[in-house]
Swiss-Prot record:
GO annotation, biological process: translation
Location of region: Disordered: 81-120
Disulfide bonds, paired cysteine numbers: none
One Pfam family hit: Ribosomal_S16
Protein name: Small ribosomal subunit protein bS16
Record-linked SUPFAM superfamilies: Ribosomal protein S16
UniProt similarity note: Belongs to the bacterial ribosomal protein bS16 family.
Keywords: Ribonucleoprotein, Ribosomal protein
Amino acid sequence: MALKIRLTRGGAKKRPYYRIVVADARAPRDGRFIDKVGAYDPMKAKDDPARIVLDNEKIQSWLAKGAQPTDRVLRFLDQAGLAKRPARNNPQKAEPGEKAKERAAKRAEKAAAPAEDAAA
């Protein structure tokens, strides 16, 4: 059974409130869970200590048992010092694709052609 530490949504329409839970990865987002290990209230101010509440002991025990946090929960755990989030370094992501490079080359070629005609 693959365990995930993830968010389940609660609250009312336009008033989200999330519980941080340990659940089977195959269970629905708001479905059955094994243990509640924290809460996240995005409606509170960013500097409010009650915005993210974590039960450190429970989280450490579930991480030791092999539970994998989702990206958002891993961000919370990194801020709390419970887990280290690896740095994402993908320099190729900012590079344009092949088609975009071809279009840019054609555009530069077209821009250079009228300039040559005007000079002649």
